[in-house]
Design a protein with these regions (language model features):
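A short, basic/flexible loop-to-alpha-helix module at the beginning of a structural domain
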Residues: 1-4
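Conserved N-terminal/central alpha/beta ligand/cofactor-binding core
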Residues: 35-193
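N-terminal Rossmann-like FAD-binding beta1-loop-alpha1 element of flavoenzymes
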Residues: 6-32
């Protein structure tokens, strides 16, 4: 098999597909190579949360952040493996990536003011606000292409339904304590399949 492309992306997880979308939006011919028979990479197994300090939605959810605090946190977490140049590049590019996808694609994100850093009490850590997740969508919109996607880990599902966004998770956790949540969960379960 021979083909020409401007950009060859290795892997179909979030990073690979994000690179492919960005390159295509820039007018380049893109090919994605995936070693597995299904798309999604390890992102499909992880639940899909992204750790993005200073993302554009932090103001909306009432969270203040700074590049300095995020870098301090990463220095504390990484120790000897801390690479200031890479950390700076990540902290500058990650919020722009969120803006790009929100503006240029159908991908939208939800932020959580209560989803903490792994070690929120560490220097520069936050009790919430840095993590975002792609907003849930109805997989049936993909038709037969849905079968091309790697299924999430069973531990991340309820009756085979991926509980993706923070808002959905809250409803599933509160189904027995809130009529609104019970109704939401019932609709989700009845609409599945």
């Amino acid at each position: 098999m021979h083909f020409d492309c401007d950009v060859l992306v290795a892997g179909s997880g979030a990073g690979g597909l994000a690179a492919a979308v960005a390159a295509r939006k820039a007018g380049l011919e893109v090919a994605v190579a995936e070693k597995e028979p299904l798309f999604g990479g390890t992102t499909a197994l992880s639940g899909g949360w992204l750790w993005i300090p200073n993302h554009p939605m932090q103001k909306e959810i009432g969270v203040a952040d700074s590049m300095h605090d995020a870098a301090t946190y990463l220095l504390h977490e990484a120790g000897e493996k801390y690479d200031a140049e890479r950390v700076d590049a990540f902290l500058r590019a990650a919020p722009r990536m969120v803006e790009f996808f929100t503006r240029e694609t159908a991908v939208q994100f939800d932020a959580s003011a209560t989803f903490p850093d792994y070690h929120p009490d560490a220097p520069g850590g936050r009790p919430g606000g840095r993590s975002i997740v792609a907003r849930a969508f109805d997989g049936r919109d993909l038709g037969k292409k849905l079968t091309w996607l790697r299924a999430p880990l069973p531990e991340l599902t309820v009756f085979g339904i991926m509980i993706g966004s923070g808002a959905e998770l809250v409803h599933f956790m509160r189904w027995s304590k809130s009529f609104a949540s019970a109704l939401f969960v019932a609709r989700r379960l009845l609409g599945h399949g």
